[in-house]
Amino acid sequence: MMITIVVLAGGMLACTSPHTSSGRTPEAEQMLTELKEVSRQNHFLFGHHDDPVYGIGWDGDENRSDVKSVCGDYPAMMSFDLGRIELGGDKNLDNVPIERLRREIIAQYERGGMVSLSWHTDNPVTGKDAWDVSDSTVVASVLPGGAQHDKFMGWMGTIADFMNSLTTSDGRKVPVLFRPWHEHTGSWFWWGQALCSATEYKALWRMTYEFMQQKGVKHLLYAYSPGTEPNNTAEYLERYPGDDIIDLIGFD
């Protein structure tokens, strides 16, 4: 049975799917349970990207949030991006210091909120950003046997290390809604519709999931999140990686 959940005010509709032998942490299981309850009650969670790190007329201030300034509290869902973390720098692609990012993710969880993470990783073939679509072989190149596979595994290792560092003071791993390879029904990212086959895209997803499992990253819920291009269910699910690795489906 598919359960519709409105997760973000930005438009993400998600559906839980059966997910066997995941070995999720209790905290990740609890987050999924709470999302199901949101759906059952026909409620939604309001979210805001990079909420506590910059806003209208400010950047980098501590203990600040445009949403809190207007509504009196932080948003239920915050999203952040992991882009450029894979390169080993000290800031992500939104110019947020990595240590600040880690701290805000943990703080959001400890105040009772949820966190979603996307990953606009750089193009491993050209060295440019995720929006560089000048080469249509990038996905194939990072899959097993591809020319960029080893480099990309190193990048994913850095992301896995960051995920595993999201730990509270009492040792709990912060549960995260992870939505890599999003908006793939468009062609503005190197993993987009015109840049790889459906088989390659599914393989990219499965490789990502299996790598995180091998690295002991058990506190993630995985979200399949196409753009708004699909006109019907068949188009929407054309590149769906499978119920055994996907926890939620949505729109980006």
Question: Where on the chain are the PLM-derived regions?
Answer:
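Substrate-binding cleft of extracellular glycoside hydrolase catalytic domains
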Residues: 83, 87-218
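C-terminal motif of bacterial Sec signal peptides marking the signal peptidase cleavage site
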Residues: 13-14
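N-terminal module-boundary/linker segments of secreted carbohydrate-active enzymes
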Residues: 18-77, 83, 88-95
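Bacterial N-terminal signal peptides that target proteins for export
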Residues: 1-3
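Aromatic- and acid-rich polysaccharide-binding/catalytic face
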Residues: 78-80, 236-252
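A cross-family glycoside hydrolase active-site/sugar-binding cleft signature
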Residues: 47-49, 79-81, 116-120, 179-181, ...
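Cell-envelope/glycan interface and biosynthesis
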Residues: 178, 205, 218-235, 250
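Alpha-helical scaffolding within the catalytic cores
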Residues: 29-31, 58-67, 99-103, 158-162, ...
